[in-house]
Amino acid sequence: MIKKHIGQALMIAGVLTTISMASTFAQNNPYQAIEGEWITLPDGREWGATSTVYYAGNGNIWVAERCGGNSNCLDTPDIDPIMLVDVDGNILKSFGKNMIVWPHGMHVDPDGNLWIADARGDEARAKGHQVHKFSADGELLMSIGTAGVAGQDKYIFNMPNDVAVAANGDIFIADGHGDDGNNRVVKYNSEGEYIMEFGKTGS
């Protein structure tokens, strides 16, 4: 008797779940997909790998694009990897040329500053393996990490892949991109001073 009641309860729960899911999927989607190339690039520039996008407010988005390919942006020193794009796909501003090797993660802090994780390094040109803070106008305000150097220390990263800034200004950097990375989270204060770290591969 108990088994019968349990079976009935499970069947009713399954039906209710199905109905709930069906009503969710039946809702109208307020968004539309854009076919073809949406962003209008300057003449002669080709679209490469898009590593990240982030909402900038007022319908605009920040886009990080790997300079027409998916490799070292320093090899194309005249191309800006960071772009601010409006709702119609027009580039409002761009910056970062000859500064970023391989843009990965992106974050906009409460003050509107843009943070970029540069997840690869170019030791010969002393760039990469850093996290950069830019103003909304593209002025470099801060860099955390040792330029072009891969490792594991308070201020040395190995493929930092993302960054987030808390409301109080504390900075959290996800350091590592794959099995060969450090795969840790490093915390700094708003001035870029080391506080602590946690996590490791497999944790």
Model-derived segments and their meaning:
Residues 25-203:
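Eukaryotic scaffold repeat domains enriched in small/polar residues
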Residues 1-11:
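Bacterial N-terminal signal peptides that target proteins for export
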